[in-house]
UniProtKB/Swiss-Prot annotation:
Gene expressing this chain: SPH
Gene source species: Choristoneura biennis entomopoxvirus (CbEPV)
This protein's record includes keyword Magnesium: no
Primary role: This protein is a spindle body protein.
Pfam families, sorted: LPMO_10
Sorted UniProt keywords: Disulfide bond, Late protein, Signal
Endpoints of the signal sequence: 1-20
Protein name: Spindolin
Family annotation (InterPro entries): Cellulose/chitin-bd_N, GlcNAc_Chitin_IntDeg, Ig_E-set
Oligomeric and partner information: Homodimer; disulfide-linked.
Record has Disulfide bond as a keyword: yes
Length: 341
């Protein structure tokens, strides 16, 4: 009976209206895949979540908040569930300088990219979504290649807006060929820009999984073929003085007919469940055992990413090559915004 009361109390915390925004539905965003699968409400602590990485993400935040807040289970549950209930608000505010990509990389979302930079439960409304940034065997959307010699695949992506924000534009990045989803965090240093343009609302297709709107953002992107699992990083940026942007990690994998060369494939060096447990704090029979070694390792990854932003070949320094494109795009979007006033 006490468990039912606790679950009801936790669930009641979410019976409020939120300013909803959206998420990738094809390929599906990491956080949306987890929230759609469910299992996060019971039992407390995330034991009902079937997907090992979704469970690790939940437990990572749950135990972090639990250990920093004097063992408040309700607060820890609220924090962890926030990653699920707020799957349409993986967002950050850039202010009027939102076209400055170095500003985005250094100040707006410098780390925890899959969480849109949200890593502190005390900061609302974004909270702590950092569990979504754990390296590991995330379930990917698998795309069959029609030809094993393909270097690029043109795909139509779909973003489901739970609230429409126009004018706006999209950027799509892809992790570079050396990225290892099992051990590497998604950081700006290992991302390459492959798409940057405005996108208009269009009717959703019959096979769409977007239930929140009859209109979606659909746009074609030429995606470089990667021999191993990779991540698309999608930024949906509003054109307004507040500079609200939405950031989604999308796990993907291309399927070869005969398979790529073995030396090109990156495979995990560990059992998936064991590694997922290493990155999450452990909960056994209500007793929480902190694993500070792994937490320090994870934070070291994030801090290194921040330090490397200005110097890495794929960090801000590389964006001078795109400076003219950004300046040109800023002028276009600024004029568009002015004409709509």
């Amino acid at each position: 009976m006490n468990k039912l009361i606790l679950i009801s109390l936790i669930a009641s915390l979410y019976q409020v209206e939120v300013d909803a925004h959206g998420y990738m539905t094809f390929p599906i965003a990491r956080q949306r895949r987890c929230s759609a699968a469910g299992g996060n409400w019971y039992p407390v602590g995330g034991g009902g979540i079937q997907d090992p990485m979704c469970r690790a993400a939940y437990q990572n935040v749950f135990n972090k908040v639990l250990n920093s807040n004097g063992g408040d289970v309700i607060d820890a549950s609220e924090a962890a569930n926030y990653m699920y209930t707020q799957d349409n608000e993986y967002a950050a505010l850039a202010g009027p300088d939102y076209t400055n990509i170095c500003h985005i990389q250094q100040r707006v979302v410098p780390s925890y990219l899959c969480a849109a930079g949200a890593s502190d439960w005390s900061i609302r409304p974004f909270g702590d979504k950092s569990g979504m940034d754990l390296p590991g065997s995330w379930t990917p959307t698998i795309i069959q290649l029609s030809d094993n010699q393909q270097s690029n695949v043109v795909m139509e992506l779909e973003f489901c807006p739970t609230a429409v924000h126009d004018p706006s534009y999209y950027e799509v990045y892809i992790t570079n060929p050396s990225f290892n989803v099992y051990t590497d965090n998604v950081v700006w240093a290992n991302l390459d820009l492959i798409y940057n343009n405005t996108v208009t609302l269009r009717p959703k297709l019959p096979e769409s999984t977007c239930a929140a709107n009859s209109m979606v953002y659909r746009f074609e992107v030429s995606i470089p073929v990667r021999p191993s699992q990779f991540v698309l990083y999608v930024r949906w940026q509003r054109i307004d003085p507040v500079g609200e942007g939405f950031y989604n990690c999308v796990d993907m994998k291309f399927k070869y007919s005969e398979g790529p060369d073995e030396e090109d494939i990156i495979e995990p060096e560990y059992e998936v469940d064991n590694e997922a447990e290493c990155f999450a704090y452990r909960t056994n029979s209500g007793n929480v055992n902190v694993n500070p070694l792994q937490e320090n390792k994870y934070m070291a990854y994030a801090n290194k990413a921040i330090r490397n932003i200005n110097t890495h070949s794929n960090g801000c320094s590389r964006n001078r090559n795109n400076k003219n494109n950004y300046n040109k795009y800023y002028s276009k979007t600024y004029n568009y915004n002015q004409n709509r006033k």
